[in-house]
Amino acid sequence: MKNNNPLDYLYPNVQQTSIINKQANLKQTLKGNLWKSIIKAKITNQNLVLEGHGINSLRFKKYISEVKYNDNTGIEAQSAKMYFNLLFGKDFKREQQGTEDTLNIFLNYGYSILRSIIARSITGTGLHPSLGIWHHNQYDPMPLASDLMEPLRPFVDNMIYKYIKNKNDYKFNKEFKEYIARIIIQPTIIKNKAQILDNAVNIYVSSIKNIIIEKNKPYIDLPRIKI
């Protein structure tokens, strides 16, 4: 492991070559529809986080129905700004790697753990993490993990919100790392059943694989956060 990401991939599935070929040749129309479903699920979970903490989200909720094929109207970016301002305050600005802001450091660290969980599940199904649906970045060796983690980011946000809620001061330290590591056991609803997040991720990723292989499975089994 390096920075919570696997250095090597092991593929236990004997049909991996066939699966990866189908993954590499996925039609753009299917990719566009998958991405629409993924972004709708992300915004839905963000809304559940807001509602779960008593934050008025009526304006935010409308974004769920506005997501289009391939998110070609950019609803994800619009909704993200409002979401973070509602959750962490109007002055909060999301920053990526290199930030010195503790809250952003918390988020980035939590997301890196989540991404590693997703990557492990992806390789376990025989899919290849380098073949993304939406993300394509020469510096990202696992764009598929970056894609599939999107609906699960609110699980990290929720844990961090609860962690800082009643603290006047918080630091990136061992206590926080031990706390956020429990992301894998967070309560989740998938296929109308309660699961821990770790199990739900495997169900979710397997459903993506089935869509890629069969090309006629009508929906993704998407995890829903349970506050």
Residue map of PLM features:
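Active-site helix-to-loop segments that bind/position phosphate- or nucleotide-bearing substrates
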Residues: 5-9, 14-227
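Short, acidic/turn-prone active-site loops that include or flank metal/cofactor-
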Residues: 1-3
